[in-house]
């Protein structure tokens, strides 16, 4: 089930889920590490990365190098709604967003890709992706010198001994997929 980091932690802590995959800014690692340690959750790093610009392969941004975030002001940003630090409201927790007047908030990943396919002037910040997904949705993932936010994906689960075989198989698959993504 897809959700924000704090929602995912709640599912593991209170709703009986066995695993959660968190994504957060590396600078917030101490917050999550302490939060999980206090609650008896084990954290297993999956991947560190910088967000890249994801856009339509034939759109204007596919051919442009963005050196300053203000260059994105005339484009439409597709934004996942989980964009604040846990427990913070408004300004302090919001990071590197460009133009509040040109945003589309979309929670579900397939819908985000569909918009990027159909709106060549749209973009979003994205994690590394499998090449087959980029090709399927006619998208390109570009490094962006103007955005250097370091992110971390971490698997979280109750620290109660060994994982079940099917859970360990899932963890192994996550590591394999993370290693083979387009970065």
Residue ranges, per PLM feature:
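Central regulatory/effector-binding core of bacterial HTH transcription factors
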Residues: 1-33
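Hydrophobic hinge/microswitch elements
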Residues: 13-18, 23, 82-141
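Secondary-structure junction motif
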Residues: 25-30, 62-63, 68-98, 164, ...
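Short beta-strand->loop
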Residues: 37-48, 127-128, 136-150, 159
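A late-sequence structural motif
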Residues: 140-182
